[in-house]
């Protein structure tokens, strides 16, 4: 074996070698014998299939297995020559040349190695952090909302007219051209006026009605209505208002605190205010981090943390970004790329900068997560997907299986780890008094959220 290995930088190496066809063919018998032991061919007992028949029937597989065996041997020798352990090899080699000549194969390949990352400049990358601390006005607004949200609905007198924020129980039926339409009928249907559970014009027609009152009114479905058979259609609705209930006002006092903080012993209004302040602070922090600081931190990490990147991984990321982009392209653009290899190469190349940045940030986040012992359990990934399914009306089990089939669970976990690492770095840069607010909230992280 004529092997040449050159280390390009700390994360990349290149090998070139010539492998004799004779060496390849010597491997055929050994591989064919392994195949013969496990295959069953009619007329022969298992393990008794003639080698000549196996070589004929499984020729392509034998050649492929022999080539793979030789390649693994080449890689093993290349790593040995470089003084690198197998665990430091990252990704699959990128074969830039694999040509069969009369007597030998000419092979050239790029090898990716785990990069060396120095994290001593991390603190320089973290932007200054100052989260808005909620004032009394904001706290009182949230308390009023809590008093409203936790208020019970109670029956009203028969003379009351329906108004926004009342809970109504109605029967209704819709007609188009005097014919009832699918999904247009319900009995004992509950809604809260003003919450936009129904079309705005439908809810407006209910305002001012009294219990036991019946009413007919026209309604035009929006042109972009989700049920296509109703979009833009003129309808007539017949409604009977069965019941009106109004919220029973709750005072902002210790009683409210006991209702909201039901799991707390001796809950008081002061404790509730403290929890509300903490909750609002967390919301402000999340908004600031997600809308501004995390992206700024990523830009700083990309700019200031310098190290060699394995080109093989960048190429793989470019392929991934290119494939994903194809799904959102117009059919005409996809066809244009299929018809022109040059255009396809140019389009793929346009993803190089994004791919390089993505790979670099992934390596940095991984190194930081290991150093700070930040991780995500599989159960947390499943919980995240369950929540996504709930919010989008999907079956959770089906969604998880879809992610599993497409090998996307690892990507979800990595995204969650990235989010935690970035938040950890930013939290460390909070002013001392704001870190104290966070510390007060942590023991209550598993308890009832307020608002």
Regions found by a protein language model. Give the residues of each.
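Core FKBP-type peptidyl-prolyl cis-trans isomerase
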Residues: 31, 143, 154-206, 218-219, ...
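Extended, domain-scale alpha-helical bundle/helix-rich regions
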Residues: 63, 68-117
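Phosphate-interacting basic helix/loop segments used at nucleotide- and nucleic-acid interfaces
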Residues: 88-97, 143-165, 349-350
């Amino acid at each position: 074996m004529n092997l040449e290995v050159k280390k390009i930088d700390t994360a990349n190496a290149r090998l070139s070698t010539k492998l004799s066809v004779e060496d390849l063919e010597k491997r055929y018998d050994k591989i064919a014998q392994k195949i013969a032991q496990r295959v069953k061919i009619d007329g022969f007992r298992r393990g008794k299939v003639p080698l000549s028949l196996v070589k004929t029937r499984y020729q392509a597989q034998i050649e492929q297995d022999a080539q793979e065996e030789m390649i693994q041997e080449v890689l093993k020798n290349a790593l040995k020559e470089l003084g690198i352990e197998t665990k430091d090899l990252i990704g699959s080699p990128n074969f830039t040349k694999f040509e069969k000549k009369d007597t030998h194969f000419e092979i050239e390949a790029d090898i990716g190695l785990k990069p060396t990352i120095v994290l001593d400049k991390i603190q320089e990358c973290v932007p200054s952090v100052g989260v808005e601390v909620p004032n009394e006005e904001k706290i009182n607004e949230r308390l009023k909302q809590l008093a409203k949200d936790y208020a019970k609905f109670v029956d009203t007198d028969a003379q009351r007219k329906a108004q926004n924020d009342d809970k109504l129980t109605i029967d209704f039926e819709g007609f188009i051209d005097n014919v009832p339409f699918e999904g247009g009928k319900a009995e004992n249907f509950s809604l809260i006026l003003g919450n936009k559970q129904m079309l705005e014009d439908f809810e407006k027609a209910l305002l001012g009605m009294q219990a036991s009152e019946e009413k007919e009114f026209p309604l035009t479905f929006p042109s972009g209505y989700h049920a296509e058979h109703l979009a833009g259609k003129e309808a007539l609705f017949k409604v009977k208002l069965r019941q009106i209930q109004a919220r029973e006002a709750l005072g902002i006092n210790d009683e409210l605190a006991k209702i909201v903080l039901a799991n707390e012993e001796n809950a008081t209004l002061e404790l509730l205010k403290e929890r509300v302040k903490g909750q609002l602070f967390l919301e402000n922090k999340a908004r600031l981090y997600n809308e501004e600081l995390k992206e700024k931190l990523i830009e700083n990490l990309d700019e200031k943390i310098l190290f060699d990147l394995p080109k093989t991984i960048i190429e793989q990321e470019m392929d991934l970004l290119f494939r994903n982009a194809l799904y959102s392209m117009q059919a005409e653009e996809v066809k244009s790329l299929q018809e022109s290899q040059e255009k396809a190469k140019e389009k793929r190349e346009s993803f190089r900068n994004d791919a390089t940045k993505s790979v670099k940030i992934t390596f940095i986040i991984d190194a930081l997560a290991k150093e700070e012992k930040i991780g995500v359990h599989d159960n947390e990934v499943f919980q995240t997907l369950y929540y996504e399914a709930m919010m989008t009306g999907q079956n959770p089990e089906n969604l998880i299986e879809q992610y599993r089939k497409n090998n996307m669970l690892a990507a979800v976990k990595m995204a969650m780890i990235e989010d935690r690492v970035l938040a950890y770095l930013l939290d460390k840069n909070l002013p001392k008094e704001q870190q104290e607010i966070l510390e007060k909230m942590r023991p209550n992280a598993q308890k009832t959220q307020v608002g």
